Amino acid sequence: DASWSRGLGDVYKRQVCLLLLSLLISIYIALDRVREDKIISIVLSIALFGILLREIDIEDFNVPMWVVAIGSGDGRTLLLSIMLAPVLLFMIVKYQKYYDLVKKYFLSQVGLSLVLSFCLLLIGSMFEHEYLLSRTLIEESFELIAYGLLFRAVFIMSQSEIKV
């Protein structure tokens, strides 16, 4: 059915818009030199970038093959690992400083939104491989709500800093 397929396209567009907006806000927060909690925004920016790359089919764009190679599949995983590894290593080295910050974040509204978003993404992924008539719509709906929660978390972060 063309209308169902078109409706699903609208869901994809909304997902990408929410992810892109969330990514831009989290990058903006990460670039704020005076915030003590910017490390959380850096990790969140990398995660949002990875989710955004997963949501868009980079192969469908008129980009060089090397961009497709690093923006999808194993290349994407390697790229994100290379981006995330130094940040996590830095956090491990500065464990005392960041342990309390991470704990406070997960006990805040931001953390609640991130945990709920993760849970909804897991639930949505369960429908990805099920053979239901509207399984894709169910999966994408869960993802859209999850991305809305990610946006909520980033928006809350942009409004106030959590200090240790």
Give residue spans per PLM region.
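Membrane-proximal helix-loop-helix units in multi-pass membrane proteins
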Residues: S45, I51-K104
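Terminal transmembrane helical module of multi-pass membrane proteins
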Residues: D100-K103, L120-S160
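Membrane-helix boundary/juxtamembrane motif in polytopic membrane proteins
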Residues: Y95-F118, I138
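Membrane-interface interhelical loops and short amphipathic "cap" helices
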Residues: R6, D60-G71, Y131-E139
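C-terminal ends of transmembrane alpha-helices
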Residues: I51-P64, F118-L133
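Membrane-interface helix-boundary motifs at transmembrane edges
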Residues: Y28-I40, K97-S108
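Hydrophobic cores of alpha-helical transmembrane segments in multi-pass inner/ER membrane proteins
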Residues: Q15-Y28, L79-K94, E143-S160
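Single conserved hydrophobic/aromatic residue that forms the stacking wall/gate
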Residues: D1-Y12
